[in-house]
Amino acid sequence: ILYGTGGENLGGSFYAVLLSDLLLGDISSSIVLDTDQNKGYIAPAAICQNTDNGIYDIIIQSYDGLVSKIDGQNFSTIWTYQKSGTESSAEPVIGNFTGDLTPDVLLVLFNGVAPAYNDYFQVMLDGSDGSVQFIDSMGVINFASANAVDLNNDGRDEGIFSVVYFNNGYFNSKVQSVDFVNDTIITLDQVRTGVNIASTPLINDLDNDGLIDLIYCVKYDSLNPMGVKGINVFRHELNSIIPNAGIAWGSYLGNDYDGAYSTSLTPCW
């Protein structure tokens, strides 16, 4: 079991403990994987299998924006990354963005201190060493965790972000795809009036026709981001087939809602 403590203004740690200990009601044997003295842990971990030893590595992110890759065999830290001045409650997303056999990491970061954010960053890290391979600042609101899927079946995943913009006095939402190979950004469906605060899209093949379906939510209210006037749910079928390697990260907590990335990687050379 992987779990975190703390929060926006309360320091905490991220732990691992045996399920059997939890069932016995005693988690005193918990192992500390990482600690943040200032802001604790809200986002769930993501895990990905190490191609060298078959052990699952663990990607965790504190609310203070500190991202750590932990060796699942001995719980040592492999690398860390932190962009100064940012926070995040978005789950790290795993995909094959750089084309080697080590899964990479996609982040959504909020610039500033809650509740007064002034920018949002979309960041892709090389899974081997945590180095920044891509960073952008799309939109005026982006709290939702990302997705990863290979839309053009070239062996590399695109990053999918649900981003809010502000134009002509009202808010609108776009689901946008970042192609890290060609360095291009496209909008996957029409621009929708309204706001998506923190709902991660679903990427799946609902009708089993071999084409990718995109399902996402947008609030009715286009003037107040926190308004409670209801939501619209949209389904859009893309002109993209299910990729040979399968969908990398199709929903919040991944394809099976367990935080695990299980796509088999093959070299892109």
Show where each model-derived region lies.
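Acidic/hydrophobic-patterned starts of short beta strands in beta-sheet-rich repeat architectures
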Residues: 1-4, 52-61, 99-109, 153-163, ...
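Aromatic (tryptophan-biased) beta-strands that constitute blades/sheets of beta-rich domains
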Residues: 20-38, 76-84, 126, 131-138, ...
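Conserved positions at the start
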Residues: 41-42, 55, 88-89, 102, ...
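Short glycine/acidic-enriched loop and turn motifs that connect beta-strands
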Residues: 6-10, 65, 110-116, 164-169, ...
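Beta-propeller blade termini
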Residues: 43-51, 90-98, 143-152, 199-206
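A detector of repeated loop/turn-to-beta-strand junctions in beta-rich toroidal repeat architectures
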Residues: 11-13, 55, 64, 117-121, ...
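Loop/turn-rich, solvent-exposed surfaces of beta-rich toroidal or solenoidal domains
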Residues: 140-177, 195-203
